[in-house]
Amino acid sequence: MANNTILAMNALQSNIIREITPLSDKDCFYIAERYKTEFTYPIHNHAEFELNFTEKAAGVRRIVGDSAEVISDYDLVLITGKDLEHVWEQHDCHSKEIREITIQFSSDLFFKSFINKNQFDSIRDMLEKAQKGLCFPMSAILKIYPLLDTLASEKQGFYAVIKFLTILYELSLFNEEARTLSSSSFAKIGIHSDSRRVQKLSLIHISEPTRLRCLSY
């Protein structure tokens, strides 16, 4: 069984499409709401971050990196790995009323001086965790559903951005319950230190040699 899985993953990797998304440099995000009877788009990756929601799609197989799962009626996944391939396959879904909402946004939306503020701690942690793909629990979906349900029809661009940021914040409160999908090695994620002191040292230009005693403070 393990060998079959590896062969299947290798076959998928050889067919990965590098998607050029419709996101404009002048837009904060791109959103597409689709009603469909089947999933046909092939496995792909792209540079932009993506939040993907599916409704009435029980039986669809979701593949993110080396993770493959058959989803239920509701599914919400955040992907921030720039080379992390993903696809939703029809598999065993017989629904004729599938709804899909895809939101793509650039990492540049959160410039460093902004995302590193204390108030964005939970969002920053969520975006980092989502480099391997992040699947949210039903409780999170229910929490943000009213916002997500109306985001595509929001006429005022500024309020749409505020609504989108609110969605990200509300989802970030479920960091502990959300599941990562792909393995670190497959998602090409390096091991980072959890120490905020070490992270801060890596961001600050140090004019003199750093001594070990500095880390003890």
How should these model regions be labeled?
Residues N3-L12, R18-L23, T80-L147:
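A hydrophobic/aromatic-rich effector-binding and dimerization subdomain
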Residues E48, E97-R99, V161:
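A structure-centric signal for secondary-structure junctions around beta-strands
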Residues I63, W88-Q90, S216-Y217:
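Short glycine-/acidic-enriched loop or helix-start segments at secondary-structure transitions
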Residues L134-S139, S153-L203:
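Short, Lys/Arg-enriched, Trp-marked, Pro/Gly-tolerant hinge/linker segments that flank
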Residues P146-D149, Q199:
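Positions in alpha-helical segments
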Residues I204-Y217:
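Single conserved hydrophobic/aromatic residue that forms the stacking wall/gate
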